[in-house]
Amino acid sequence: MIHGSLSDLTALLSLEALTDERFVAEPRSGSRWRVYGGQFLGQGLIAATHGADLPVRAFHGYFIRAGNATQPLFYQVERLSEDHRQVRVHQEDKLLFTMEVVLGEYGSAPGIPMPDVPGPDACIPREKGIQNLQTDTESTWAVVDSPFDNRFVENIWHDVPAPPQHHVWFRTRQSAAKHDISAMEGQHMRQAVLAYYADDTIMDNALFPHGWAGSWERLQTTSLDHAMWFHADVPVDTWLLHAQDSPTAGGGRGMTRGLIYRQSGELVATAAQEILMRVSTGR
């Protein structure tokens, strides 16, 4: 995930239009390692909604190959219908990611009530949990320097097997109004910011039964796909609760899902993801 402010994140998600259907994302200064999955999701939404008036109702993205964060990414959009877009991402002539995006107005309806959990002020800041886990000050700085403020209901920073679920309060550290994404014309960027964030912690639920803190050394993990459905506008600079779980994890695969609520209890988005999990051989 990106270091820096909300301005840095919106700059990352913004694309240069080569044509009305082809876009490029240039690498950021200091980029290294592979492309974070949420970057594909957020940039894919920005590409798909270019020139669109309607918000995104749903998308489903498939991760095909890892991307090199030091090289440009090229986004090609095909307009399948008035409200249906397909996005394909290439790097050096290799297909990395595909996404189907559906546009449409929100439709409110009764849903699963928000879990009864403590509010964000009573929860564990992410940087505190990381500091309790290890002494790598550079990693801790990276968490503090994130565009997002995260507050965890459960203490996940241990290597004891735990139930495959947790709850996280989150919001951007800076106001959306100060970054020109609070008005109606900023709705696509708000959705892209949420899609970018939603890929961050949802995978962890499949790892908790293995002892989350020790899983990263024992397991190799990667996202296979990610889907989201938007039920209402997304106020990314106010507290949102991401209630997550993993209904099944076995045979090298893990299924995870998340419900995202306003603090008032309104369900604003639903997410689902499948991941690949392999035991590391240490070679």
Region spans (language model):
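Terminal targeting signals and extreme-terminal segments of soluble enzymes
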Residues: 1-283
